[in-house]
């Protein structure tokens, strides 16, 4: 997978990317732009979002993805600027340190993670689908996680539950709207070498080591590798891929024992 793809599968299409200011979102904005898409960068961090939009020659819309009115305005801005909403990569999310074992995680921490990781995906799908229905075509990619498929001994209870919700919602929407030309898939990355992961594991190196040893490929993913998967799901190359949990996890979910 390359950061500078020669294929241009998305020429003329409009892609809305939430959490576009950093990590997977930024890498995906770059990749989709390289493949010819118009990019609408959404982020609550104005400086990071503007930088992403400038780099990808796209549009920045400052967005709190937990606010229904701001989410509606985001997709309206995409349509007003470029004339269509073809791709929605609903990716914004958090993984705060106070989300831990169920025994230690407070209700406010639980609610905050659910709002950002799950409710935001609901709001973004709800806003994007009407545009895609009118067009008769569209691809929605929602960021879930490999932990939506597997239990984790190093628990982040609200994060895991939120990503399980994203997985189930994506499956249902993919089935519901398939005959209207809309595909909905859940992207399930393994641990990715992003600022979010580095911040989390810097505070707990032992936790990082425990994660790393279980990855058959022996390393964390790079954000551009996840972006390549998003580009595939956004493109017509995945025209028969729908309502799936699309795993990009380096083999974690397929490993019965830890590789030597």
Which role does the model predict for each range below?
Residues 99-102, 106-111, 211:
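Substrate-binding pocket helix/loop in short-chain dehydrogenase/reductase
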Residues 2-7, 99, 231, 242-260:
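Short C-terminal tail/terminal secondary-structure segment
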Residues 125, 162, 170:
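Active-site helix of classical SDR
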